[in-house]
């Protein structure tokens, strides 16, 4: 086992990465190794998809399957070894079928790629785990060096984050053949074990640019299906009644659950990255979408244990449900998996609903506590002139984007303290689950504008980018000349690709924390600082002084 993809990876003086019987996330060595094998199979599949395109063959099933299967290897998504193997088997069947179609056009066709003909050695998991040792991500690290290895991981993990957003978009009926072609090109290239520093850096930026287009179609899918988010008050305290909790990012799953629970007397609560759903007109019209429950994903073992109903996980992040003894009432969907828990294959939530009806639910209404969400792309763009006027009249000094992933590391209190320290003549935009560090605090208003603007999920960084672009156009300057600073927390691969997207667009002077990614060496961090001014957080006082000048 070797895995260094998330922020909580083991760090030692001799190297970083989880490499023992179990990762810090709870992923076993078996599952980790099988995920490496799956990635190798998917890289071979992408090599064939590229060759097929040269022959005029575009296989939409492969285009949708490949990023979905890759998504299953993201941090805190799928811990079920059998299902990981199932994805690998399906990938090989799809590859073989595509090869037959290619050879009907050109019987001599071959694919010059080391993984193009990769087969599984067995159906037996121990044998497959042994085979997977060939594809452990640090196999040639001693040969190529830490910097090359780190750049490979930057590209691989960035592409993994983009694959997740591609799947979210596809679920909403949004896809783009050019994006799929780019995805396959990067995936196949990574399977060749690239060693050139400049190519690795350039392709990392290319993955970031590709992801900007992915976020654009995802934004389109969400707003076409559910309307543009509107500022909306959300109760974060329970109300009396039977309950289902839904977590993850998949708004379509939430919509289907709301439809299927209408008239049942069951209240639906969002958790984690589902919070922004309350701002979408076509979702908030359901009266039994009553509020948001809990905080950051890392607290779920305590919070889920106290929730008096079933829990539906639609994407990341899931952690061991046995710790809180709620494994019998957590349900997984799509690419999510945990061994021994209930998995829903289709779109019928009847088993979840029946379980909720058989449970007590919340016994009484707690005192209401409202927070505001729904400052999506259109709302932000509509406010652009107001922001410009406030800046021009010196009533608004600076805008901070403080957000990203949450996690359990104690150093993450920095982001709470930073938000608290933002001066009264400044506003804060936030997004992703990092907002839970401070989104229940009262920041008041500035000239009628809320000082805390919840932009949405992690992919809604697109909304913040579009606001920055519009402001820069109106003011006749670059994005980097705006009174805007980004202070981002990271945990997993979606955050990595959003960072690559920002860097690829030329956004500079980003502060990141709580720690640098374990795969980025000091040399690589120095390169990112030199090229983009990207820097690790230090102390709130020091960073605030550096940003505001005093």
From Swiss-Prot:
It catalyses: A + NH4(+) + H2O = hydroxylamine + AH2 + H(+). It comes from the Bacteria. Binds 1 [2Fe-2S] cluster. Binds 1 hybrid [4Fe-2O-2S] cluster. Keywords: 2Fe-2S, Cytoplasm, Iron, Iron-sulfur, Metal-binding, Oxidoreductase. One of its GO terms (cellular component) is cytoplasm. Its EC number is 1.7.99.1. GO terms for biological process: response to hydrogen peroxide. Hybrid [4Fe-2O-2S] cluster binds at residues 249, 273, 317, 405, 433, 458, 492, 494. The keyword Oxidoreductase applies. GO terms for molecular function: 2 iron, 2 sulfur cluster binding; hydroxylamine reductase activity; metal ion binding; peroxidase activity. InterPro entries: HCP/CODH, Hydroxylam_reduct, Prismane-like_a/b-sand, Prismane-like_sf, Prismane_a-bundle. Its cofactor is [2Fe-2S] cluster; hybrid [4Fe-2O-2S] cluster. The modification Cysteine persulfide is found at residue 405. It is found in: Cytoplasm. [2Fe-2S] cluster binds at residues 3, 6, 18, 25. It is an enzyme of class 1 (oxidoreductase). NCBIfam families: hybrid_clust, PRK05290.1. Belongs to the HCP family. Catalyzes the reduction of hydroxylamine to form NH(3) and H(2)O. HAMAP family: Hydroxylam_reduct. This is Hydroxylamine reductase. It comes from Yersinia enterocolitica serotype O:8 / biotype 1B (strain NCTC 13174 / 8081). The lineage of its organism: Bacteria, Pseudomonadati, Pseudomonadota, Gammaproteobacteria, Enterobacterales. The gene is hcp.
